[in-house]
Curated annotation (Swiss-Prot):
It comes from Spodoptera frugiperda ascovirus 1a. Coiled coil: none annotated. InterPro entries: DNA-dir_DNA_pol_B, DNA-dir_DNA_pol_B_exonuc, DNA-dir_DNA_pol_B_multi_dom, DNA/RNA_pol_sf, DNA_pol_B_thumb, DNA_pol_palm_dom_sf, DNA_pol_type-B, RNaseH-like_sf. Replicates the viral genome. Host DNA polymerases cannot substitute for the viral enzyme in this process. It comes from the Viruses. This is DNA polymerase. PANTHER family: DNA POLYMERASE CATALYTIC SUBUNIT, DNA POLYMERASE DELTA CATALYTIC SUBUNIT. Gene3D superfamilies: DNA polymerase family B, C-terminal domain, Helix hairpin bin, Palm domain of DNA polymerase, Ribonuclease H-like superfamily/Ribonuclease H.
């Protein structure tokens, strides 16, 4: 009725695609006269729900859905007598109503007793909670503070309830659950998807800039299944800026910083260019740009200064009316610079007014969701505006394609679009900025080149987003997990799992804990609180392969192992508890799962083997007659603590001191006379020992302590848990969607279904991970550890069944997969594919439903196993032929921390192995690859490596991390200097250089680029070359673009790249021929050649 009174035009229902839900807080002044005749005033704060959407033609619309309320649940202690109609309940209700600040919320209908099932534990089937509804978020949090006594400073006494119960003992739920999530789950509406409305009314006054705006009733809205596979017409645009930045550590805050160009590429084919330039050059610039055949619909906006440019950008973006704006690396650069410049020029509010809402200003939000407090320049941010999604396409690629070596726009465009950026350098950009307001033929030509470069960057970003259908992926994940699109994009797994679990708990009438983020929520220990303690259990089972070349290898895989384990064993928060946990159920109602965990203890198989290898190594050392210069260094992970750092050279029984450098710049020894680079050539015994040692060190580095325990949990059988039902629902939905894909012919509909089934799969597999995250939203140690233990038991059971019942040997097994040795008998007529499928079916029959062992379609004629997660195979086709190319799995050819040269040099010797070459041919192939590098015929682009650079903090300052009590330089842990305080006062520059020298080489190079005012690192991965240095402390890497722009600044260290081939190819040689000196024989001439060159260079310098 209220909606009808506030509107004057009515129309029938319609379908809309909703992509953004917003709850708007409105205030209304009220006044009254009390008994004493005093005029009193107060504010009524209400929550109004809006839905920003598009219709079937792509026109934007806003649905105003009226007032909504937010809920809160109060949990009293188990022994507290809360009975309906009792005297205690009446007193409790009166006390709770006193703590409610809003007059309208004090109605008794807003404070009710409800029965709900607790999420954690196997106690009572239901428990009594107090449900309270509020008309505002402010009123809800004020109520909590009053009950706990935190509404005043200093804190006062908490509220007192009957039976001497203090308000501090009450636990609150749903405090941090967003109001829109509560409302949408209650009304079964999707966060992204098609909805069907009831009768629509046009309001008298419009509050948004949308094409259409209606008022309608929230209960009349329902999800539209008929249009589920219809792709919405979403208008989007990509933008890019060009700016002069003088201090990259604080971009945009320097007095001489300036944004002088912004480009916008709209999905309808329109381009916009906003540039600071003389007004009379607009026509010439348009004519110059339109000579390019790709630019036909361009609008140029010339501004006289930077303030005008920022205001014009705001005006143009609003006039476009797009539902999403995106860019490449905008969160870490473009948005940061624009916000900094708007702050310096006092136009922040105008700049942020880029959304559809007229009455709600935009705000700056970090990608973690924080909108309050001081935001550091190093924090990634985005502009949070109503009805317009702010997306970073680079972040989409980082989360989707995690194995790319780098995430620069140039590289990603070349890989996915077969396109490239325009060849504009930093020098060109700086030259244009220095002559920005000049008019000459050279300046006009340069202005046109840079403008085209900026426009192309925006176009490439838009094309990449469309090419990979990232928006479709985001909307499908948002629909399935009941999570806002922007939250799916930025906050990843834990937040999605929280929203999904809340939806399921609300549907099943389960009280879900959400006390995370609320300090001192309750002083008493609860089950949920104990779940956040550090987890202590061993990981998945891995059977290491015996290195070697195998023929006829098949693979089997447990389909969705962890999700199906949850279904098969009824694993949930409310069904899995410790063995001795008290319960109202008898032992007959439980299933007991027992196992042993041994990590780092004397029973750990890794430690047992390591102890055995140490004894063997000691015996070998006693009987070895070779001359010892010092302690042999085995790997970079196992360095001697005392004594000279010497590397053994097994060649002609001679020894020499040498330097062995690795990616992190560490050195075993130093020798200024001989700068010889040679890798440690290890025997198979030493290699095996180093591999075991590496496992131990990795376990310690991950924070795992020594664990030696017999574990046991009990699982309730009489009550179905929420997690099994949720996982089963997701898997069945995926199966149904994949079935529908077979009958769909429309490419757009098929693409939507494909993204939908992938979202179902990712979500189902993420549930196990969310229970095991100790710092997650909903941790559960018991579920995580029993799921992992059952996974180990399942794969071990499968291996044993294959061995005992079918006489099949398992070569290698990891987590949920196993590689088996098939019969290699030419006289046998048995089809290997049929045999593997029958084996999988037989093993499946022994497992608990719905667990299934699936046979992979690929049979490998040959497989070279090198170690854990490291093997190379050649596929066998059904006609008896073999594949020409090899399948590379986690060797240097697919790892992104190796250069293209190392990858290309590694492949020819391996191909020789699969061609049944001799040992001499293998050595010759290695020598040929090295010779190509020594002849300097390899371009520097092939020598480029990439490495991750984490956050370096705000202004490169040392900060104490209160959580770990460690001194941090950004995200890097460093040791604090003993004289830190004195040096900070007397010589801060030296102190900064000292800490920088303690960082890894890529991080040092990133800081050096900042000091040089070079462009920031895109995607958190820096490209560099390894170069020669004269001193140990010098940085042995150089950024690739700086190396190209400054020829002669450094010399490529060829021997470093040759050394990178030693360990990987030695593994191949040991696996095939059991020889460790193959690579050493191949590279020996190059080592001596490099040594002679170094001596000649030294003598030449001395003679000069």
């Amino acid at each position: 009725m209220l909606l009808k009174m506030s509107a004057f035009t009515a129309r029938s229902s319609d379908n809309f695609y909703v992509y953004d839900w917003r709850v708007v807080s409105t205030e209304k002044e009220n006044s009254y006269t009390d008994r004493n005749g005093v005029r009193r005033q107060w504010k009524d704060i209400t929550l109004m729900l809006r839905a920003y959407c598009v219709d079937e033609k792509g026109a934007t619309a806003c649905l105003r859905l009226g007032q909504v309320k937010t809920k809160l649940y109060c949990e009293f202690p188990d022994d507290y007598p809360l009975e309906r109609g009792g005297a205690v309940w009446r007193s409790v209700r009166a006390k709770l109503k006193e703590a409610i600040t809003c007059k309208h919320d004090q109605d008794e209908s807003n404070v009710q007793l409800v029965d709900m099932q607790p999420l954690y534990g196997v106690g009572k089937a239901t428990k009594t909670f107090v449900a309270i509804s509020f008309t505002s978020e402010v009123g809800k949090r004020a109520f909590v503070n009053r009950v706990c006594g935190r509404h005043r400073k200093p804190p006062s006494a908490a509220l007192k309830f009957p039976n001497n119960l203090s308000g501090e003992r009450i636990r609150f739920h749903w405090i941090n659950v967003p109001t829109e999530l509560q409302v949408l789950v209650q009304h079964k509406l999707p966060f992204a998807g098609w909805v069907e409305t009831g009768r629509l009314y046009e309001p008298r006054s419009r509050l948004t800039r949308c094409d259409r705006e209606y008022c309608t009733d929230l209960p009349a809205l329902k999800s539209s299944e008929l249009l589920a596979c219809v792709a919405p017409s979403l208008k989007t645009f990509a933008w890019d800026i060009e700016a002069k930045i003088n201090d990259m550590s604080m971009p945009g805050y320097h007095v001489d910083d300036e944004v002088y160009m912004v480009s916008i590429a709209v999905s309808d084919g329109t381009d916009h260019l906003i540039i600071t330039a003389p007004g009379e050059c607009e026509r010439d610039l348009v004519d110059a740009l339109r000579k390019d055949k790709d630019i036909d619909n361009l609008n140029v906006h010339v501004c006289r200064d930077e303030v005008s440019l920022l205001l014009k950008f705001n005006q143009v973006t609003r006039s476009i009316g797009a539902v999403a704006r995106m860019g490449w690396n905008v969160n870490r650069f473009d948005c940061v610079v624009m916000m900094a410049r708007a702050t310096q020029l006092n136009c922040v509010n105008t700049l942020l007014d880029m959304g559809f809402a007229k009455d709600v200003p935009g705000q700056v939000s970090t990608t973690a969701g924080r909108t309050y407090g001081k935001i550091s320049p190093s924090e990634p941010i985005y502009f949070d505006t109503h009805g317009v999604l702010c997306l970073d396409v680079m972040e989409m690629f980082r989360s989707t394609y995690t194995k790319l070596p780098k995430y620069s726009l140039q590289y990603v465009s070349g890989k996915f679009l077969n396109a490239s950026k325009d060849p504009v350098t930093l020098k060109d950009l700086n030259e244009l900025h220095s002559r920005l307001m000049e008019r000459s033929a050279d300046v006009d030509r340069l202005r046109a080149v840079v403008s085209k470069y900026c426009i192309r960057d925006s176009r490439l970003t838009l094309a990449l987003c469309n090419k990979c259908a990232h928006i479709t992926s985001l909307t499908e994940m948002a629909r399935i997990t009941n999570t806002p699109i922007v939250m799916v994009h930025y906050q990843k797994q834990q937040r999605r799992m929280f929203h999904l679990m809340f939806s399921e708990c609300m549907r099943e009438n389960v009280a879900m804990q959400d006390d995370f983020g609320l300090a001192n929520a309750a002083p008493f220990e609860t089950v949920a609180a104990t779940q956040k303690k550090q987890l202590s259990y061993s990981g998945a089972y891995v059977k290491d392969p015996e290195p070697g070349l195998y023929s006829m290898v098949g693979s089997l895989d447990v389909n969705n192992m962890y999700p199906t384990l949850m279904i098969a064993y009824n694993l949930c928060y409310s069904t899995v508890v410790d063995e001795h946990s008290p319960s109202a159920f008898t032992d007959d109602h439980f299933e007991y799962i027992r196992w042993e965990d041994h990590v780092g203890c004397e029973h750990d198989p890794v430690q047992v083997e390591l102890k055995s290898l140490r004894s063997m190594f000691e015996m070998k050392a006693l009987t070895d007659k070779r001359k010892r210069i010092g302690v042999t260094a085995i790997t970079k992970y196992f360095k001697p603590i005392q004594g000279p750092r010497i590397i053994q050279k097994i060649m002609d029984d001679r020894y020499a001191e040498s330097t062995c450098r690795y990616d992190d710049g560490d050195e075993f020894c130093e020798n200024d006379d001989e700068k010889e680079v040679i890798a440690a050539i290890k025997t198979p015994l030493e290699m095996q020992r180093a591999a075991i040692r590496l496992k131990v060190l990795k376990s310690r580095a991950s924070g795992g302590s020594v664990l030696c325990a017999k574990q046991c949990v009990k699982i309730l059988k009489t009550r179905r848990g929420i997690l099994p039902d949720l996982v089963e629902c997701l898997l069945q939905a995926r199966k149904r969607v994949r079935g529908n894909m077979k009958s769909v012919t429309d490419p757009m509909a098929r693409d939507i279904l494909d993204k939908s089934q992938l979202a179902y799969k990712v979500t189902a597999n993420s549930i196990y991970g969310s229970t095991g995250a100790s710092n997650g939203k909903l941790p559960c140690q018991n579920v995580a550890k029993v799921t992992t233990a059952l996974g180990r038991m399942t794969i071990l059971q499968a291996i044993e069944i294959a061995r005992t019942e079918r006489n099949v040997t398992t070569i290698y097994s990891d987590t949920d997969s196993m590689y088996v040795q098939l019969q290699d008998d030419p006289a046998s007529n048995q089809d290997p594919w049929t045999y593997v499928r029958e084996l999988a079916t037989h093993i499946t029959s022994k497992l608990r439903e719905p667990m299934v062992i699936e046979a992979e379609d690929d049979i490998h004629a040959k497989v070279l196993f090198l170690g854990k997660k490291c093997y190379i195979g050649r596929k066998l086709f059904r006609d008896g032929s073999v594949a020409r190319d090899l399948d590379w799995h986690v060797v240097i050819t697919v790892r992104r921390d190796h250069s293209e040269y190392v990858k290309s040099a590694y492949k020819p010797p391996v191909y020789k192995v699969f061609a049944d070459c001799t040992h001499d041919q293998f050595v010759t192939s290695i020598a040929e690859s090295c010779l190509r590098l020594m002849r300097r015929t390899v371009p520097c682009e092939m020598l480029t490596k990439t490495s991750e650079v984490r956050n370096l903090g705000d202004g490169c300052q040392l900060v104490l991390c209160k959580k770990t009590m460690s001194w941090m330089w950004g995200d890097y842990k460093v040791a604090r200097h003993e004289q830190h305080d004195r040096l900070q006062r007397e010589n801060p520059k030296w102190l900064r250089d000292y800490y920088v020298s303690k960082l890894p080489a890529p991080a040092r190079l990133s800081i050096l680029l900042t000091d040089r005012a070079r462009p920031p690192v895109e995607g958190g991965r820096i490209e560099f070359l390894n170069v020669k240095t004269e001193t140990k402390s010098a940085l042995a890497i150089e950024e690739i673009s700086y190396f190209k722009d400054n020829p002669g600044c450094a010399q490529v260290d060829n021997m470093y790249y040759i050394q990178q081939l030693v360990n990987p190819l030695t593994k191949v040689s040991e696996a095939v021929w059991r020889r460790s000196n193959s690579v050493n024989i191949a590279i020996a001439p190059f080592i001596y050649y490099n040594k002679v060159l170094a001596q000649l260079s030294t003598r030449f310098k001395i003679s000069q």
